[in-house]
């Protein structure tokens, strides 16, 4: 199971850009999002300069332990500058392959362990860049009562909603935890759902 990355919609002002807008650097391509209504330009939007800058900044804010390659967040920008051409080319030609996730055991209160997969920093940045583009597409499809890992929503809002239901007279709560959900979800079904909304086959 992979550790979820925090997803936010931000304008990303300030320093520490992957590539400053006025200075050639790392990593971006000279393409601007066309915002085609058929969604066939998602790949360009993912690799657009500002989107990559935002993705890098968000990964830096999230922090977290290194992945299997041992790269820390402090080394990510240096890596991007040194490997600009090969990094971008691998994304464009479809040869980019994410690294295996690092398996980590987290102790559970009942004595067991929760297995987590920690992605490499560069993979987190790419995941974040993709999420920032496709999140608005799927956000409107989610349940109004879903509060987990969604921009602009929080656990506090979920608590307030529960209090609202309690004040309406509801007195019972059903606590459900799906065992090994990310390991057992039907990925083919999930991919079919994604294909219905994402028409850019490069993504």
Annotated model-derived regions:
Residues 1-203:
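Non-catalytic terminal/accessory segments
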């Amino acid at each position: 199971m992979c550790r979820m990355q925090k997803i936010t919609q931000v304008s990303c002002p300030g320093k520490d850009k992957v590539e400053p807008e006025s200075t050639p650097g790392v990593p971006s391509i000279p393409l601007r999002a066309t915002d085609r209504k058929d969604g066939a330009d998602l790949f360009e939007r993912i690799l657009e300069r500002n989107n990559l800058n935002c993705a890098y900044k968000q990964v830096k804010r999230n922090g977290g332990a290194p992945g299997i390659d041992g790269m820390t967040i402090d080394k990510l920008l240096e890596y991007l500058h040194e490997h600009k051409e090969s990094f971008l080319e691998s994304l464009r030609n479809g040869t980019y392959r994410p690294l295996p996730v690092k398996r980590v055991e987290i102790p559970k209160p009942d004595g067991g362990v929760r297995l987590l997969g920690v992605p490499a920093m560069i993979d987190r940045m790419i995941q974040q860049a993709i999420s920032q583009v496709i999140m608005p597409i799927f956000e409107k499809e989610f349940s109004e009562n879903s509060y987990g890992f969604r921009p602009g929503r929080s656990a506090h809002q979920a608590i307030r909603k529960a209090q609202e239901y309690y004040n309406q007279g509801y007195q019972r709560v059903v606590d459900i935890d799906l065992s090994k959900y990310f390991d057992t979800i039907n990925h083919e079904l999930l991919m079919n759902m994604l294909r219905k909304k994402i028409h850019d086959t490069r993504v």
